[in-house]
């Protein structure tokens, strides 16, 4: 008699999803899937709106990575009005650096939330710890000083975002061709020196290093478990800049294989020539893949692990030192170990802090050349924007009619890019923890969630559960009859 186990909902991720695992008569895993059960429809909602509303409208997809959607939309609008990089015209240095400042501040803030609030509980307490302990409240009780540092670190990132975009959430600064405001000297000094109850930028870097050391300690104690947990091969993809390394704001899309050979590299405006999307009836989320390789061989991994696989170096000294250690661990090959995503995420927190410090010292942020006026007859009616969001490569593609109203929108978000590899991760973990015995335990079910949480999936808006998980496990026979159900 086959069995069907349901983990519904998956907790401590952004949004709502469930996991379904199918077992055969011998309790071997037949299949395992991540079901995304929410339908948002923002691509349809934005149609008919004026094109200039897109960055403000579509950033409301998420309360966590809204800066990425805002900037991705702004870059697409740069294209539409004829001042985008596709036309060979660049926004002013002040505009680009202001956008980059806010982007890296969000990288720091978002990764801090994911790493410390959602992932560290498993690192400190273990997968088998009681649900009431395995969350941020448990962290407060076990290590209040750590939580205080994390709160201050996240606050600092939020304040930089506010200074750049005008609001802590759903900003208003980026416009077609540039930005509305620069950064004042008073604001700059506030972040550099730690005024008004904020950390200084050097303290931020110190705290980021503490986070990296936390992973090193965890890895040293649990090396075998961490390394063997869902080692799932996949292609890796991210934006690379003119220096041939990861660029979080602009570049070419590069895809590499397990030997770090370049499989494809292309201008992101041509993404439709290279990628297709599969659809499954059991999920509202699509499955992108490289056309020439097909769905099974052409799926990609994006996000911290994908970026650290693709890039050869990082332009900041402390993060570069950490990256060298990361690369040395796999002896030059691609790192496919799912839980090493958290290692990569910790490196990116440090890198973002260092980049923000460099940008704060850049005098271009105080200049007043903010918006580039489009040349005559420059309107193209179509634009594509791509950035590296915290969770991975994010793409916005818009078309508008002669009145400037949007007629088409396609959003390829990082979690969608990771959809296939997340499902493979679920299958791998299910085989290790469920196959052959079928015993349902708290630690076993949470192990599947741990695998998903490593990708920090943003399924819709920010939804985090505290305390005991509202988890339901249902067992069905081959005829689809419910024969057992457990809830807590």
Curated annotation (Swiss-Prot):
Its cofactor is FMN; Ni(2+). Ni(2+) binds at residues 62, 65, 458, 461. Pfam families: NiFeSe_Hases. InterPro entries: Ni-dep_hyd_lsu, Ni-dep_hyd_lsu_Ni_BS, NiFe-Hase_large. It is found in: Cytoplasm. GO terms for cellular component: cytoplasm. Its EC number is 1.12.1.2. It catalyses: H2 + NAD(+) = NADH + H(+). It is an enzyme of class 1 (oxidoreductase). Keywords: Cytoplasm, Metal-binding, NAD, Nickel, Oxidoreductase, Plasmid. One of its GO terms (molecular function) is ferredoxin hydrogenase activity. The keyword Ligase does not apply. Tetramer of an alpha and a gamma subunits (flavin-containing dimer), and a delta and a nickel-containing beta subunits (hydrogenase dimer). Belongs to the [NiFe]/[NiFeSe] hydrogenase large subunit family. PANTHER family: COENZYME F420 HYDROGENASE, SUBUNIT ALPHA, F420-NON-REDUCING HYDROGENASE VHU SUBUNIT A. This is NAD-reducing hydrogenase HoxS subunit beta. It comes from Cupriavidus necator (strain ATCC 17699 / DSM 428 / KCTC 22496 / NCIMB 10442 / H16 / Stanier 337). The gene is hoxH.
